[in-house]
Amino acid sequence: MEPDSGQLTVAVQRSAHAVVVRPEGELDRDGELPLREALEKAVAATPGLLVVDCAGLTFCDSAGLDLILGAREVVETAGGALVLAEPGPALSGLLEIAGAEEVLRVYGTLAEALAAGEH
């Protein structure tokens, strides 16, 4: 049986000053568990900057955005920062409609997000 092409997978990469979480596939209420688990671990381990690299997302609904916003709140309460990189069309429209760009820092590339966190 072939895996669902929209199934969400998540890669995590750590560096000295950041944790990068890269979800790939469809982020919705039914498939958010891999990202939820990765964010929970990253939030507990982040040295200050948590970057959610959204370049691999093909879809995101309000449940996915709520998950990201909840993680941002936890990270900021602990004194860190959560930023988004490369939201692309799957997430950009949702960010705009929800007004989430008012509370989330969004960068066009992963490199820009990481560089902003070094300052």
Residue ranges of predicted features:
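Short, low-complexity, intrinsically disordered N-terminal peptides in bacterial proteins
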Residues: 1-7, 115-119
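Long, contiguous secondary-structure blocks with strong helical propensity
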Residues: 17-18, 81-82, 86, 118
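Glycine-centered tight turns that cap/initiate beta-strands
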Residues: 17, 100-103, 109
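Short secondary-structure boundary/capping segments
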Residues: 2, 11-12, 74, 96
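Conserved catalytic submotifs in the C-terminal HATPase_c
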Residues: 15-16, 55, 87, 111
